[in-house]
């Protein structure tokens, strides 16, 4: 695809009119048919849809998340519904994912429950892999990719990116993944594309020749497919 769209829709999103719904109710009310029709009218070939950001929630009944902290999922499987509605137009679905952290105003205990501990990150990494494996196997080829944000949070934990990648590609070995390094060089070779935060100049970049393959020919992101958001 030449281009896609990214949508930031989370537990903190507000409706245009009326009061904010409880997350599960907002997921239940999401009109996927109208959404897919709108995306199709833009000509986009794929979308990146935000799942968790800031607060850790996920719009589907994922047992591994419920086991960590109940009340962070939904009974409706919005991801599957998006795959179906977008797929009717030939549009692929990718998901944005943030490992989550406590709410900055009212800490809710997510980081403690998920095992985030810089001195012993094994529980945190194990939980992340369990969540990714369940989600990946649930959606298979319907889930085309992952955009993992905020690499500055988990890179200092020295995770095994090969292990994370295997979990990320569960159910679909062709699923593309990236770990957002912000403005820093890439964190690992075990990824498929460059997230592109702050890379608005990609069209004129010396390492991305015009009419080329779209893959960096040199520099800190050499061999990664270029992407910007």
Specify the residue positions occupied by each region the protein language model found:
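Mature catalytic domains of secreted/periplasmic carbohydrate-active enzymes
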Residues: 1-229
